[in-house]
Regions:
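Active-site histidine-anchored catalytic micro-motif
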Residues: 1-126
């Protein structure tokens, strides 16, 4: 995602402005974070499970009313993406995205199974 945004800024010769991105899936999110294995593969997941757990202590899928409507098991996934947000806006200056040295624009998959995701983004500026 981040490399595509940077390439679009260069291709359109836009030096300064903002990018806004949106993931069209209902159970994914866009954010900035340090893409470090412990954070990405453990800490974020544990934090989200503390807020809206997928399984109980016995390993059973926790029932959410969403499951009654769609007959699936990803009610907690919708809550996770709601908290993290499916969109992001970030400024760029001199053709570079303005994020910290350890930050990355990141798609966070919140669903209970793998999916292919589309990200729509716009670059606005001069």
């Amino acid at each position: 995602f981040q490399s595509a945004v940077s390439a679009a800024c260069k291709e359109k010769d836009i030096k300064s402005g903002i990018i806004t991105g949106f993931t069209t899936g209902g159970v994914a999110a866009l954010t900035t974070l340090e893409f470090e294995p412990g954070l990405v593969h453990h800490d974020v997941r544990e934090a989200m499970q503390g807020i809206a757990p997928y399984r109980d202590e016995k390993g059973h899928v926790i029932h959410y009313r969403h499951h009654d409507t769609w007959h699936d098991d990803n009610g907690s996934s919708h809550i996770h993406s709601l908290i993290l947000s499916p969109f992001i806006t970030d400024p760029f200056v001199d053709g570079k995205i303005t994020i910290g040295p350890w930050q990355n624009l990141t798609l966070v998959e919140c669903d209970t199974r793998d999916r292919v995701r589309d990200i729509v983004f716009q670059v606005m500026g001069e």
